[in-house]
Amino acid sequence: LRLAANGIKAYIFETLRPTPELSFAVRHLGCVAGINVTASHNPPEYNGYKVYWEDGAQVTAPKDHEIIDEVEHVTDFHTVKTMSKDDAIEAGLYQYIGEEIDVAYMEELKKQIIHPEIIKEVADELKIVYTPFHGTGNKPVRRILAELGFKHVYVVPEQERPDPAFTTLDYPNPEDPKAFTLALKLAKKVDADIVLATDPDADRLGIYAKDSKTGEDMPFTGNMSGMLIAEYILRERTATNRMPVDPVMVSTIVTTNMAAAIAADYNVELREVLTGFKYIGEQIKWMEQAGKGHYVFGPEESYGCLAGTHARDKDAIVASMALCEAAAYYKLRGKTI
């Protein structure tokens, strides 16, 4: 309503959506910016303000500093313009969005699938446990897996519904093994192959997978999951002649050196950037502007990655999809991930 009062049209999701879908929506709707209020994987008192620019990536310098400068100039909140919702809607400055964006987002995700036929072959066998940690990933992760044909997705019932207090968790972080307690209990019950957890704003993915030798569920670090997905995507895109010209993988300087080895093995350029996924998103924009290099994948050690360019921020929904496709590929060959 503050935006509307200043003559700026705003699209508002009618209910919860994951952070990467906002990044997608900014681009899809041709917006100049996007705003997301979230605490991400932190406790609710850390609720904060994420800003995305017209390319769908989080703002970098100098825009981030300029935004804070404007905020600090406000000394009296009563001077900030506002208007009623009814007036904003009547003026065409306040518009709800929802299912139409969901559908477009799902279709973009599906473009990243390499072997849909393999998913169908093992759909009756592969068992997946998933928890959204009371957050926004619940509907989109389940939807994309169902639409791709995965038949056995078991959601942790205690953590299925949105809960801003994260009642069942000390810390809703997929890096924390304790956060997987309920998911691992369910995995034992259903004899799951893999366990997935997305953080509350669904931009990071945590994984456990069954060890074929011990039968125990083993945790993956962000480096491990990122490299597994990277190797699968680069290998299978190369094998199916779906690798673009001048392919580029982008990772951060604190991500494992294995990224360089994998990229070199498939003749993919590796670019390393500063810590923070916003710098990976920035690289995609620069490639497009220069007309040189085609982004394929971007992993970071802190459990985030992005396959494709539909969004410009880490995306746990596309990561879940890619991981499950890889798991299906290996299961068909009698292997676990």
Question: Predicted regions: what is each one?
Answer:
Residues Y11-I12, W53, A57-A61, Y94-E100, ...:
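Hydrophobic alpha-helical scaffolding
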Residues Y52-T82, N223-P247, S251-I262, A316, ...:
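Glycine-rich phosphate-binding loop plus the immediately following alpha-helix
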Residues L1-Y46, G149-I207:
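N-terminal small/polar loop signature for handling phosphorylated ligands or for N-terminal nucleophile
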Residues T19-E21, N42-E45, T136-N138, P162-A165, ...:
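Flexible loop/turn segments at secondary-structure boundaries
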Residues N47-T181, K185-A187:
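Gly/Ser/Thr-enriched, mixed-charge loops and adjacent short helices
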Residues L1-L3, Y46-W53, D203-N223, A259:
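Short Gly/Thr/Asp-enriched flexible loops that form oxyanion-binding sites at enzyme active sites
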Residues K188, A192-I194, E216-M218, E236-I337:
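Phosphate-binding and adjacent anionic-ligand microenvironments
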